[in-house]
């Protein structure tokens, strides 16, 4: 045991004794986690303070995001400090297995790829010694904790801080006030350290928690009006109670607007306070020192809010306007027009009247600047937040090459015609530290022997693996993959009660549940395979486990119906004795970052099946590629670049291209595909014909495919159009898997080609091309 690890263990023991009168051997995993976290926070505090002091005088970038999917921090922090293995051994000497911390809750601060991207970016910035600070919200209960009851999604509050939150520092003295039309709230920052890998830099993620100015109305309490006594407290805390509150009602929309305004106003007040401390009150120099990146449009209210704050400091509107448009840059994350955020002016006026007025003034300025164009920010009584972000930013970027091209050619083509210099591409990336080093140490052992150390900071070094993919290397890789499958089987049996066979192909689709991500296509295809195996039309089939993981938004009926249908398909197949040794289906509950760390290294097939032109990029595809899964996917998002890097012969690409979809879309007749394809028809009919139990929501899915639903046209996302192509690709990968050496070589080519998809590369490009910041050591 080294002196350092011995000190950590002793301090942890001392804290447990002081706080709980317990020994290491007597304590619970939760209390061990809290004590160890506090000790590590003390150990890094000096580097954290030094980092802040080094970065404060210079130019800095700030990342505004509604989500940060940071996952479980204890292992990743120990890993980035370079002491994970050492600490496991040190605690083992005391009879304590740090694997007990596997049961610690993930921090419930995000949901999908948007939040995980933000977390990866902060990790990369700290590792590269870049002055990037994250700002977000500290949600008391996150999105929700998912479970299945009778196959249906159930949502429960995710009480992730129930046993403490040792990785945050509450900073009361830095609290700020945020005013709405009907209330004023205290916003208290909680700082999370972002520990760089193999560096002394410790970045900061600052999260705001809303609290009441007055915790208790004592007069109301004495008058025994207990509801009124706590009314202000509850109303304030509601703002940061959950991520993405249901906004199907007026009050729900007001709460969403309040969330977004708190993120914007509190963060900007904090930034301006630091600016004044370092540079005084000469706000005309603000763009020299400050760059703010908007991660999608949730923080877009920052634009009018900065104008408002500068005007409150004495600047006139025109001066504040010109300064503001030199501070912000905007990352777009969707190509679907219906997903672009817009707010009714009446709604904004009822919550943030001053901000609403400034948005209208910005719109007037735009129309004055470009009187002969169709550009707008306000239209039909609505503020279009993406348009506001494009107009007021120095740079606008997509997150994959195909996505960025669609922004220029379609979504923002009128803006691109006037501001072509603003539009850039920054293909997303993932941190190799968490998604390879931490989650797959077995594969790292093989890579160390082939390309040497260093690839976790310079992922393009994996390219050197290509020359050495011989039969022995493939066999070593296959053995590692089998071990990761065995590990996942144990996790799934513990959490889901489903026993999987690790010798099966592991076919994985894990991502947010949305119709455009086409989990329903996957499920219908599985049903088709099942029925075809049963009737003998498919005779040779390599045994496969189909693994799903996804949460559906609480108010998204059809997404929840898809989950229920997948679970019904799973019940049918898993209870059929004829499918023993042939096929299994499992939908894991409460899929999150920590579950992903088990699933992704075990996957053989990465399902990336959204219709071309709908997924901005995706990052799950990159994580799966890095861990040696082949992509079964469309030419959408980053799939295009994955196939370019690894070679299309090492992926399984299917489906219509963007150009083909645009060509067929105007006259697309879903019913004609349904009628012409008996296998498709048989699979789709299982939604309603009693093959599996059905209900009103499942009938709605069926109707949405054949007749349309709400604003959707029939088969809005072209499941029928791509059905046969998907089936052929799926059967091809199923057949190819039998040649374990040839298939293993494809997998290793994916690992060796993943260098481009490091978030280190992405962050370097943001730093150089958009934020104009350099490393500060």
Say what each PLM segment does:
Residues 1-777:
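A conserved ligand/cofactor-binding region detector
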């Amino acid at each position: 045991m080294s002196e350092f690890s011995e000190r950590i263990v002793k301090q942890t023991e001392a804290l447990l004794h002081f706080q709980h009168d317990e020994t290491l051997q007597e304590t619970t995993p939760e209390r061990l986690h809290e004590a160890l976290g506090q000790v590590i926070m003390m150990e890094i505090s000096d580097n954290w303070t030094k980092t802040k002091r080094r970065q404060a005088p210079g130019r800095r970038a700030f990342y505004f995001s509604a989500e940060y999917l940071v996952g479980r921090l204890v292992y990743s922090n120990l890993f980035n400090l370079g002491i994970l293995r050492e600490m496991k051994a040190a605690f083992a000497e005391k009879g304590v297995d740090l694997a007990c911390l596997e049961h610690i809750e993930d921090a419930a601060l995000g949901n999908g790829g948007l939040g995980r991207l933000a977390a990866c970016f902060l990790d990369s910035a700290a590792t590269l010694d870049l002055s990037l600070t994250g700002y977000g919200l500290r949600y008391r209960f996150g999105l929700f904790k998912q479970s299945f009851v009778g196959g249906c999604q159930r949502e429960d509050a995710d009480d992730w801080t129930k046993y403490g939150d040792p990785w945050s520092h509450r900073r009361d003295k830095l609290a700020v006030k945020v005013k709405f039309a009907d209330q004023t709230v205290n916003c208290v920052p909680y700082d999370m350290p972002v520990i760089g890998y193999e560096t002394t830099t410790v970045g900061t993620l600052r999260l705001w928690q809303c609290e009441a100015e007055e915790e208790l109305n004592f007069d109301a309490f004495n008058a025994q009006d207990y509801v009124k006594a706590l009314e202000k407290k509850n109303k304030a805390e509601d703002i940061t109670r959950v991520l993405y509150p249901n906004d199907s009602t007026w009050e729900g929309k007001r709460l969403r607007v309040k969330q977004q305004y708190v993120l914007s106003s509190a963060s900007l007040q904090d930034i301006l306070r630091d600016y004044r401390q370092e540079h005084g009150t000469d706000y005309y120099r603000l763009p020299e020192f400050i760059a703010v990146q908007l991660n999608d449009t949730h923080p877009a209210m920052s634009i009018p809010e900065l104008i408002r704050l500068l005007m409150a400091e004495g600047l006139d509107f025109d001066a504040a306007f010109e300064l503001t448009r030199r501070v912000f840059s905007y990352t777009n994350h969707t190509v679907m027009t219906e997903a672009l955020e817009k707010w009714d002016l009446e709604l904004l006026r009822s919550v943030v009247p001053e901000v609403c007025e400034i948005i209208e003034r910005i719109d007037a300025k735009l129309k004055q600047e470009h009187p002969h164009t169709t550009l707008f920010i306000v239209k039909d009584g609505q503020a279009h937040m993406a348009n506001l972000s494009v107009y007021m930013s120095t740079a606008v970027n997509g997150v994959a090459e195909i996505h960025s091209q669609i922004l220029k050619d379609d979504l923002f083509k009128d803006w691109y015609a006037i501001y072509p210099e603003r539009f850039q591409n920054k293909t997303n990336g993932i941190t190799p530290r968490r998604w390879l080093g931490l989650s797959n140490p077995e594969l790292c052992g093989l890579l160390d022997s082939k390309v040497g150390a260093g690839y976790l900071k310079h992922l393009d070094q994996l390219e050197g693996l290509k020359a050495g993919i011989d039969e022995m290397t493939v066999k070593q890789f296959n053995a590692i993959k089998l071990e990761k499958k065995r590990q996942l089987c144990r996790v799934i049996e513990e959490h889901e009660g489903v026993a999987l066979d690790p010798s099966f192909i592991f076919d994985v689709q894990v991502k947010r549940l949305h119709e455009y991500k086409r989990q329903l296509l996957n499920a219908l295809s599985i049903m088709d395979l099942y029925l075809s195996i049963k009737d003998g039309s498919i005779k040779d089939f390599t045994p496969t486990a189909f693994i799903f993981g996804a949460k559906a938004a609480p108010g998204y009926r059809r997404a929840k119906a898809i989950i229920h249908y997948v679970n019904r398909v799973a019940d049918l197949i898993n209870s059929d004795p004829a499918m023993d040794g042939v096929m299994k289906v499992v939908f894991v509950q409460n899929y999150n970052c920590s579950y992903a760390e088990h699933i992704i290294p075990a996957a053989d097939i990465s399902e990336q099946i959204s219709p071309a032109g709908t997924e901005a990029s995706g990052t799950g595809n990159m994580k799966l590629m890095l861990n040696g899964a082949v992509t079964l996917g469309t030419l959408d998002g980053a799939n295009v670049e994955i196939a370019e890097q690894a070679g299309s012969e090492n992926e399984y690409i299917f489906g219509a291209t963007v150009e083909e979809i645009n060509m067929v879309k105007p006259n697309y007749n879903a019913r004609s595909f349904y009628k012409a394809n008996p296998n498709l028809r048989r699979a789709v009919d299982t939604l309603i014909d009693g093959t599996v139990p059905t209900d009103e929501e499942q009938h709605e899915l069926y109707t949405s495919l054949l007749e349309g639903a709400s604003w959707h046209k029939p088969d809005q996302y072209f499941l029928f159009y791509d059905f046969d192509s998907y089936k052929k690709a799926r059967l091809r990968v199923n057949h190819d898997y039998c040649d374990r050496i040839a298939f293993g070589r494809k997998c290793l080519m994916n690992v060796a080609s993943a260098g481009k998809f490091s978030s280190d590369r992405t962050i370097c490009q943001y730093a150089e091309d958009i934020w104009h910041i350099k490393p500060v050591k």
